[in-house]
């Protein structure tokens, strides 16, 4: 999967006036590309409001890092559960009309979740870093900042708001950027969940040093279709190597019932990231409990 960054279009002068012309290649080719291009512009606005030097200083007063990876590996469940807090998605729209991020995270905690994932993207998922901070203040579980991270600024932003782990999506990052951002996260004491969608991306990630946590996203981010076979296929091909190297595998998306957990567990996943199926339940705490008990 190849995701382009937004191309720069030089201004064209006509007399004293300048125009910004748009060519055919200035339009994003898919949903993920659209999100990435919007994120680049959003980052420019963040940097104007809060320069990196000031943001880095804020991380010094951030709450102590919790052990995200340890929580997954020490889970009392056959498959560790990362329960996701998000209000909406580009493919499904608003998922929960009575959305209360703190109450939702607390319900997940009561239900037996091992960690919480918090969507912070505002434009496409109606999330925020404020939600992350509020959840950190009220919930004892380790937190994953679910964001479309393009550079170190967002990792510092996540840490300043209380995150213990960050998501790094292989499809939108070069190998050099992945390696660098993993080091930044490690320097801050945070875990990096490196997400892949196909065998090519998984092989890229396995060629990097220091990878401890790999997420296999069953959702194709080009068209948002979900297939659990993605986890099964990749672990059939590389599961032995992942296990030999001690890498914890998280199966992401498409988990709706205990049978789905059992299926990805059999394939070799040690944890699952679950969002939509929990968000649509009247009682998210019971939903987490049923999911775990159904394995």
From Swiss-Prot:
Record Pfam families: IGPS
Pathway note: Amino-acid biosynthesis; L-tryptophan biosynthesis; L-tryptophan from chorismate: step 4/5
UniProt xrefs under Gene3D superfamilies: Aldolase class I (3.20.20.70)
Keyword list, A-Z: Amino-acid biosynthesis, Aromatic amino acid biosynthesis, Decarboxylase, Lyase, Tryptophan biosynthesis
Protein origin, superkingdom: Bacteria
EC number(s) from the headed UniProt entry: 4.1.1.48
GO-annotated biological processes: L-tryptophan biosynthetic process
Transmembrane segments: none
Gene Ontology molecular function: indole-3-glycerol-phosphate synthase activity; phosphoribosylanthranilate isomerase activity
Catalytic activity: 1-(2-carboxyphenylamino)-1-deoxy-D-ribulose 5-phosphate + H(+) = (1S,2R)-1-C-(indol-3-yl)glycerol 3-phosphate + CO2 + H2O
Keyword Amino-acid biosynthesis applies: yes
Signal peptide: none
Annotated family: Belongs to the TrpC family.
Protein name per its UniProtKB record: Indole-3-glycerol phosphate synthase
Species the sequence originates in: Gloeobacter violaceus (strain ATCC 29082 / PCC 7421)
Gene name for this UniProt entry: trpC
């Amino acid at each position: 999967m190849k995701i382009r960054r937004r191309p720069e279009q030089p201004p064209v002068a006509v007399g004293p006036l300048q125009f910004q012309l748009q060519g055919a290649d200035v339009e994003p080719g898919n949903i993920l590309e659209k999100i990435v291009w919007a994120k680049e512009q959003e980052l420019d606005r963040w940097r104007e409001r809060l320069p990196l030097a000031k943001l880095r200083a804020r991380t010094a007063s951030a709450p102590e890092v919790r052990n995200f990876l340890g929580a997954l590996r020490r889970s009392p469940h056959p498959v560790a559960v990362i329960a996701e807090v998000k209000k909406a998605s580009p493919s499904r729209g608003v998922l929960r009309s009575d959305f209360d991020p703190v109450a939702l995270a607390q319900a997940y905690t009561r239900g037996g979740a091992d960690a919480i994932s918090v969507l912070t993207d505002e434009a496409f998922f109606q999330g925020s870093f404020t939600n992350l901070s509020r959840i950190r203040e009220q919930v004892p579980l380790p937190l994953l900042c679910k964001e479309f991270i393009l550079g170190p600024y967002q990792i510092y932003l996540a840490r300043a708001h209380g995150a213990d782990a960050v998501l790094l999506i292989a499809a939108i990052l070069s190998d050099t950027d992945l390696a660098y951002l993993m080091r930044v996260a490690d320097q801050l004491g945070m875990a990096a969940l490196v997400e892949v969608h196909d065998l090519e991306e998984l092989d890229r990630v396995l060629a990097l040093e220091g990878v401890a946590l790999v997420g296999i996203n069953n959702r194709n981010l080009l068209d948002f279709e979900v297939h659990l076979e993605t986890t099964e296929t990749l672990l059939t091909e590389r599961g032995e190597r992942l296990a030999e190297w001690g890498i914890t595998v998280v199966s992401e998306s498409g988990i709706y019932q205990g049978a789905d957990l059992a299926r990805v567990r059999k394939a070799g996943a040690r944890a699952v990231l679950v969002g939509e199926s929990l968000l649509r339940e009247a009682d998210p705490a019971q939903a987490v409990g049923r999911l775990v008990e159904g394995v």
